[in-house]
């Protein structure tokens, strides 16, 4: 993507963090976050549950330093990796941009019928 959104550190509380992530998942931009090693597992779990499971994710550690490390892929595989290899140091997380939603008029009519609007032309 050609757009970046820098979000910095998200809230440490799970509910607040999930709300922030839900809003960030609506963006069509790569999201850049900071995270502490102690909260990385919780952040990755929340990314997965708030719509980021299909997005590419990169966990970058100790950028510009001797022990620089980048792990990328689906969030599910990153969760498994960091469950076995605890993160250390300064962490930057990148979440790839979401795909533009594609639907046609029949999809919209079906959704409106489901919520009881009864839209018809």
Model regions and ranges:
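A contiguous loop/helix-start segment that scaffolds small-molecule binding in enzyme catalytic cores
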Residues: 30, 37-121
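Class I SAM-dependent methyltransferase SAM-binding "motif I" and its flanking Rossmann-like core
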Residues: 1-27
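Small/polar loops that bind or transfer phosphate-bearing groups
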Residues: 8-9, 32-35
């Amino acid at each position: 993507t050609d757009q970046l959104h820098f979000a910095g550190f998200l809230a440490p509380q799970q509910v607040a963090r999930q709300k922030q992530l839900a809003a960030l998942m609506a963006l069509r931009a790569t999201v850049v976050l900071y995270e502490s090693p102690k909260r990385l597992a919780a952040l990755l779990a929340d990314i997965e549950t708030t719509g980021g499971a299909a997005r590419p994710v990169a966990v970058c550690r100790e950028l510009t330093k001797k022990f620089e490390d980048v792990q990328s892929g689906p969030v599910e595989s990153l969760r498994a990796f960091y469950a076995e290899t605890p993160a250390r140091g300064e962490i930057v997380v990148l979440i790839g941009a979401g795909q533009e939603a594609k639907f046609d008029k029949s999809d919209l009519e079906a959704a409106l019928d489901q919520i009881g609007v009864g839209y018809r032309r």
